[in-house]
UniProtKB/Swiss-Prot annotation:
Record-linked Gene3D superfamilies: F0F1 ATP synthase delta/epsilon subunit, N-terminal
The name this protein goes by in its record: ATP synthase epsilon chain
Species in which this protein is naturally found: Bartonella quintana (strain Toulouse)
Subunit structure: F-type ATPases have 2 components, CF(1) - the catalytic core - and CF(0) - the membrane proton channel. CF(1) has five subunits: alpha(3), beta(3), gamma(1), delta(1), epsilon(1). CF(0) has three main subunits: a, b and c.
Major localization listed first in the record, in broad terms: membrane
GO MF entry, a single one: proton-transporting ATP synthase activity, rotational mechanism
Domain of life: Bacteria
Family affiliation: Belongs to the ATPase epsilon chain family.
Amino acid sequence: MENKRVEHFLFELVSPEKLVFSEQVISVVIPSASGALTVMAHHEPLVASIVLGSVRVLTSSGEKLFAVCRGVANITSSGCSLLVEKVVAVEHLSFDVLEQQISQVRATLEGDSDDRISHKVQDFFHQLTNADGVLTEA
């Protein structure tokens, strides 16, 4: 039987406050302005705008999920870095924190007539609350 080696690349997730994640990974799915973008080793160079959504990171030890808000992705053949305005590791997000953040977003969107943004926010929170057991009761 042929032994295929999975190639890894360096993925870094950075907020204005700190380096949130830096590890060799198998793949990353990021929420770009043009849709979900899957990055793997040896990807063509690309700079992409990041929108509100979730980042799925596949590592040798499993999958990690992060909630992100706006930013930029710099993808090279040897790695990928995301600089985002806000990021939360979903496994560290409690229902109380999630409810507080939902309330803040709703307050921000009150009076906003842009249904497209409202639907994106609803889809994003739906993804978070259905993240297959990664959220824990506070």
